[in-house]
């Protein structure tokens, strides 16, 4: 097992060279941004047959195969990245329009279809005049950067007996905390949600991570699918009712206009009392399984919590997130073995929600996330590491960005273009009291210390 870890250490060795000299000037200057982005809106990864096993009622039909980026997902990404370029322009990193200078963008995507197509949509929105290209892993099998355990780069996560008990306790607490949402899912879908659940810890040589099976896994997956449906067919979903304002104050005129369109009477969706004689009625709503956006957001914490518990768990995060975090850090420092990434003002990795959860778990980063559950990663979410230079040195800062819910729940191009991105500034571990950032060398050292974790397993 140790030889696997030594392969990963080779990636981390790129952090060791001396960090270049500090920049001149008093005002901090944004020198570089490294982004880890989730792919855009996709269809469920489950097959129609798998979805049919969850409920006797039909599900809406998608016009792409399971797990593929949809046309609407690509559209949302284009608008999101058009806005993001304007934000970077305001910060002085890149020009607001025109063809990008050669070498200013390094875009690397996981090789599967939904991430590659997401990268294409990102380019179309960010630099429609050209000036960028998409890079992917050329070898056989899965990309070791995004799938280090499955590809064999890193060993399977090994959980101690205490860590296993802790995970089970967290899942039990989740079931108590989200009892109302789980009951709602049970009434929507039927007995599949009520099946017992179990955690499966990987054996050495299986190239797997920790997995959840059973009713709680079904509930978690279904909660995500219901949200994806709302984002794919927002008009249809909003016809079911629900208020999606999320309690935000000081809305812009364009956001107020959006919410006037989206607001509707209280949901016509009500859950009958569950009884022993009739634990799961065949129908709660007529027609395909679908809920309003408000209901979807109330159910989503089931999925977000399961994701957090499994993917942020230390052994899982180390095995699955350490190589990617090491590469991102080395690019910030300008010491990676990829000269194009070192020289680029903006580096973007297009991966998956699990990648963001793994890296955020290693850095102990958390976000409130507005209308969405805390720490959740809606389609297109971005975990951003930025490098700021001043006469006092180089500082790394972190933030979380995503498209606004108002943009996700409209088909109006004006709204999608004009509603600002949702942003949260995050606090890095060991950060100073101002701005939540860390000196670059201290941040690199902190990442290096993470290598001690799997070496002890």
Question: Across the structure, where does each feature detected by a protein language model lie?
Answer:
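Short, solvent-exposed loop/turn segments at the edges of secondary structure
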Residues: 5-8, 378-380
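Positively charged n-region of N-terminal signal peptides that target proteins for export
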Residues: 1-3
């Amino acid at each position: 097992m140790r030889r696997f870890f030594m392969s990963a250490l080779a990636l981390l060795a790129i952090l060791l060279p001396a960090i270049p000299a500090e920049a001149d000037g008093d005002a901090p200057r944004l020198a570089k941004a490294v982004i880890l982005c989730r792919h855009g809106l996709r269809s469920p990864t489950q097959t129609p047959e798998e979805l049919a096993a969850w409920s006797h009622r039909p599900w809406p039909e998608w016009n792409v195969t399971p797990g593929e980026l949809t046309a609407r997902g690509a559209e949302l990404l284009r608008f999101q990245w058009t806005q993001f370029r304007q934000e970077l322009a305001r910060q002085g990193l890149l020009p607001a329009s025109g063809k990008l200078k050669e070498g200013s963008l390094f875009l690397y995507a996981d090789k599967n279809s939904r991430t590659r197509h997401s990268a294409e949509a990102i380019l179309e929105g960010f630099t429609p005049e050209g000036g960028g290209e998409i890079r992917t892993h050329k070898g056989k099998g899965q990309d070791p950067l995004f799938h280090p355990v499955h590809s064999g780069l890193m060993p399977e996560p090994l959980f101690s007996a205490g860590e296993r008990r802790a995970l089970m306790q967290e899942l039990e607490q989740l079931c108590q905390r989200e009892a109302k949402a789980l009951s709602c899912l049970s009434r929507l879908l039927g007995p599949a949600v009520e099946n017992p659940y179990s955690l499966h810890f990987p054996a050495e040589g299986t190239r797997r991570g920790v997995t959840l099976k059973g009713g709680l896994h079904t509930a978690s997956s279904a909660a995500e699918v219901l949200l994806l449906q709302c984002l794919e067919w927002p008009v249809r979903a909003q016809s079911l009712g629900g208020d999606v304002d999320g309690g935000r104050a000081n809305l812009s005129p364009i956001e107020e206009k959006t919410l006037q369109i989206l607001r509707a009477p209280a949901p016509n969706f009500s859950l009958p009392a569950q009884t022993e004689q009739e634990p799961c009625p065949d129908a709660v709503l007529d027609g395909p399984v679908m809920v309003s956006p408000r209901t979807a957001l109330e159910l989503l914490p089931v999925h977000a919590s399961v994701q957090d518990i499994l993917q942020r768990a230390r052994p899982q995060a180390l095995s699955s997130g350490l190589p990617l975090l090491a590469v991102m850090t080395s690019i910030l420092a300008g010491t990676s073995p990829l000269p194009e990434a070192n020289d680029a003002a903006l580096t973007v990795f297009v991966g998956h929600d699990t990648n963001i959860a793994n890296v955020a778990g290693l850095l102990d980063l958390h976000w409130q996330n507005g209308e969405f559950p805390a720490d959740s990663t809606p389609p297109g979410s971005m975990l951003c590491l930025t490098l700021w230079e001043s006469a006092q040195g180089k500082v790394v800062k972190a933030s979380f960005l995503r498209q606004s819910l108002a943009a996700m729940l409209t088909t109006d191009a004006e709204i999608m273009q004009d509603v600002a991105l949702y942003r949260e500034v995050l606090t890095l571990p060991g950060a100073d009291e101002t701005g939540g950032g860390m000196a670059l060398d201290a941040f690199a050292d902190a990442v290096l210390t993470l290598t001690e974790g799997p070496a002890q397993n």
